[in-house]
């Protein structure tokens, strides 16, 4: 019988948590945002091919977990499963389909094994300056918070889409 034992399941679970925790730690080490580097205002997760969250890193902000749990499903629906390729990177700060507010940016990458979609990795990080008046009492509308980035491809099959880059650099 080839059914994994409880010990094997626990080893696999610990490995998955280790991988997603390393994802979060890499983000902390390389972040430009002081909110990420010093306050840990981020979240990292691993997802199955349907966009269901399998695990979330221990490092980060628990407040991101609800938005992160639903986000990848929105990415799959907006991008279209038939348009998901190796080398892609997706991005958004859509407060309704990914982040909670414009100052949180979510990045999702599909993961492939032998040319077949195996799952997704996603992370959300707080960006202090996204333009606008800022979130909170000063902003009367979400559109006053700053730049709104709809769910889109930032990288298509390994090639950076310069449109968003040019808009941000403005």
For each feature predicted by the language model, list its residue ranges:
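Conserved mixed alpha/beta core segments that line enzyme active sites in large multi-domain catalysts
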Residues: 25, 30-33, 52, 69-110
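A short, polar/charged loop-to-alpha-helix boundary motif
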Residues: 62-74, 128-137
